[in-house]
Swiss-Prot record:
Disulfide bonds: none
Name of the featured protein: Probable potassium transport system protein Kup
Organism field: Chlorobaculum tepidum (strain ATCC 49652 / DSM 12025 / NBRC 103806 / TLS)
Gene behind the chain: kup
Membrane topology value: Multi-pass membrane protein
Signal peptide, first to last residue: none
UniProt KW Transmembrane keyword: yes
Catalytic activity: K(+)(in) + H(+)(in) = K(+)(out) + H(+)(out)
GO CC field: plasma membrane
GO function terms (MF aspect): potassium ion transmembrane transporter activity; symporter activity
Family: Belongs to the HAK/KUP transporter (TC 2.A.72) family.
Length: 613
């Protein structure tokens, strides 16, 4: 794996040592610092890394790739494209996948906040008087990070890898020094210390699991980034560099707690010698910025996938690199994240308080990923039922334990990512259902392509020389823009293309299968452009590929006709009135087809159509 990829994939999980151990002994549900508790918490944390990250995600979940792509939406699309289940079962699985994706937005708001804030707080160790500056400095760093997004990361990306490599090396060495001083801490590798801790501490021990989970919050990112860097490089880098560095640092923090319990308020920086505090604060800040950048990029990618799959309204998506197609910038998502993270930092005031809000969204997403993986392994791969049930039983027990512990923090801030998740989930389902209802209404008011061509055989309108392309949401029906144009202007161009963009349930579609041209009678063509959910439609590419199949359309001579729907509510249907009004509001504010498909504005004719839903 390239050095640049190191920061993208492992930035989130790599910065967890800043706050994970601290929250167990100095957080909302903290426990006393003593030998049994330190060994128990450390044992739970180590085995969480081994069982959740190494075994569950890197060994099993990453097997479920959608033509190389990972992530919860890719996993959901894999199930949709291969599932033979009835509609209700598919709807449940799709809804689970969508809710998991929606929860990741809540995580995307909290991760930059807690990561950068916990790094900047280190300066208080040297100069406690700088305490009042922590929040303003954190907000300034976050604001700068988001304001820089439209420039892309191509120029600074080459620095990410070396910085993260230095980060892992530094935190590993700091931990190793303390382990040498207190080698007895290595006993925590035995799992019975963790089990004994849970038994002896009863409910309080269970609640501490919510803080232990903070060490593995970046596991879902490893799966999501699989398409960019590959399964094998991620596994190797984890095994040879990241996991050893994390274990050394966590063991080192445990050793510090046993030798100097008073330092439980920030055991990470307690590992660092006094002369190295300032360099470590700078390095930690850079590492958390890189981790935040990776998560922001992931949110941009998730948003693009949601748009392509039809669950998010069309938004502006800008490409920030000519050589790397995956580097994109989504302004709406960027500003929403920016204001949310700044509000969280100002509202919670410390990384310790933010930690109470962190984790519940990720645990829920991990639970959902496990459920979706179960159906893939059972229905698509036909795994042995007994072995699969035992494996998933173990994973579900672990995930449910962490989820239950995280939910206990509901009134301490954990409500925030859940509210965000439910709100976005509602918006996604409303948009999808509204579009289906809208398409049905349009389809009922228009003609099929075959009916239209048959009508031309009976009576043709006046044909004018020229080329026209009509965008259509359904390749089998004539767009209303064409019928309205004929009704009002009484003309039809000599060459007409009915263009339909179809998003497939795969990440990418090869050029050889991307465009299908079906020649109809009377100078008409049906053009079906197929794109994957990781791709961005390109009208010029479509026309170039279509012209290779017998069309002769000139890009500078085409008139593009598109519908401009005005949605009014009132028709009786299964969709509630408030959701119809919400859908109409979303449709009014969605990016126009002209802007989304980058059509030449001087060649576009929009025809208004009123549709009642």
């Amino acid at each position: 794996m390239s050095l640049a990829a190191l920061g993208v994939v492992f930035g989130d999980i790599g910065t967890s040592p800043l706050y994970a151990i601290r929250e167990c002994f100095h957080g909302e549900f903290s426990i006393p610092v003593n030998t049994p508790n330190v060994l128990g918490v450390l044992s739970l944390l180590i085995w969480a890394l081994l069982l959740i990250v190494t075994l569950k995600y890197l060994t099993f979940i990453m097997k479920a790739d959608n033509e190389g792509e990972g992530g919860i939406l890719a996993l959901t699309a894999l199930i949709i494209s291969h599932s033979k289940k009835n509609k209700s079962e598919r709807w449940i699985l799709v809804s689970l996948g969508l809710f998991g994706a929606a929860l990741l937005y809540g995580d995307g708001m909290i991760t930059p906040s807690i990561s950068v804030l916990s790094a900047v707080e280190g300066i208080q160790i040297i100069a406690p008087s700088f305490g009042p500056l922590v929040i303003p400095v954190t907000i300034a760093i976050l604001a700068g990070l988001f304001l820089f997004q439209h420039h892309g990361t191509a120029k600074v990306g080459s620095f990410f890898g070396p910085i993260i490599l230095l980060w892992f090396t530094s935190i590993g060495l700091c931990g190793l020094v303390e382990i040498v001083k207190y080698p007895a801490i290595l006993k925590a590798v035995f799992p019975w210390y963790g089990l004994e801790f849970l038994v002896n501490n009863h409910a309080k021990g269970f609640l501490v699991l919510g803080a232990v989970f903070l060490a593995v919050t970046g596991a879902e990112a490893l799966y999501a980034d699989m398409g960019h860097f590959g399964r094998r490089p991620i596994r190797l880098t984890w095994s040879l560099l990241v996991l050893p560095a994390l274990l050394l640092n966590y063991f080192g923090q445990g050793a510090v707690l046993l030798s100097e319990p008073a330092k439980s308020w920030n055991p990470f920086y307690a590992l660092v010698p006094s002369w190295g505090i300032i360099p470590m604060v700078i390095l930690a800040t850079l590492a958390t910025i890189i981790a935040s950048q990776a998560l922001i990029t992931g949110i941009f990618s998730l948003t693009q996938q949601g748009i392509q799959l039809g669950y998010i309204p069309r938004l502006t998506v800008q490409h920030t690199s000519a050589s790397h197609i995956g580097q994109i910038y989504v302004p709406a998502a960027n500003w929403a994240l920016m204001f949310s993270t700044i509000a969280l930092v100002a509202g919670f005031g410390s990384s310790s308080k933010l930690a109470s809000a962190y984790g519940v969204a990720v645990t829920a997403t991990m639970l959902i990923s496990a459920v979706l993986f179960y159906y893939v392994a059972r229905d698509l791969w036909n795994w042995n039922r007994l072995g699969l049930n035992l494996l998933m039983g173990m994973f579900m027990l672990i995930d449910l334990s962490f989820f239950g512990a995280s939910v206990s923090k509901l009134f301490h801030g954990a409500w925030f990512p859940l509210v965000i998740g439910f709100a976005l989930f509602t918006l996604m389902l409303t948009w999808k259902q509204g579009r289906l209802l809208l398409m049905k209404q349009i389809q009922d008011r228009t003609l099929t392509v075959s009916e239209f061509t048959e009508s031309l055989a009976i009576q043709q309108p006046q044909r004018v020389k020229g080329q026209a392309i009509y965008l259509t949401a359904n390749p089998d029906v004539v767009p209303m823009a064409l019928l309205h144009n004929m009704r009002h202007n009484k003309i039809l161009h000599s060459e007409v293309g009915l263009l339909h963009f179809s998003t497939e349930r795969v990440p990418r579609v090869p050029n050889s299968k991307k465009v299908e041209v079906i020649q109809l009678n009377y100078g008409m063509y049906k053009i079906i452009a197929r794109y994957g959910f990781m791709e961005y439609p390109n009208i010029r590419q479509v026309l170039a590929l279509a012209n290779q199949q017998g069309m002769h359309f000139r890009t500078d001579a085409i008139s593009y006709f598109i519908n401009r729907e005005k949605i009014v509510t009132g028709m009786k249907s299964k969709m509630s009135v408030w959701r119809k009004k919400l859908f109409a509001l979303m449709a009014r504010n969605a990016l126009s087809a002209t802007a989304y498909y980058d059509l030449p504005s001087g060649q576009v004719i929009e025809i208004g159509v009123q549709v009642q839903i």
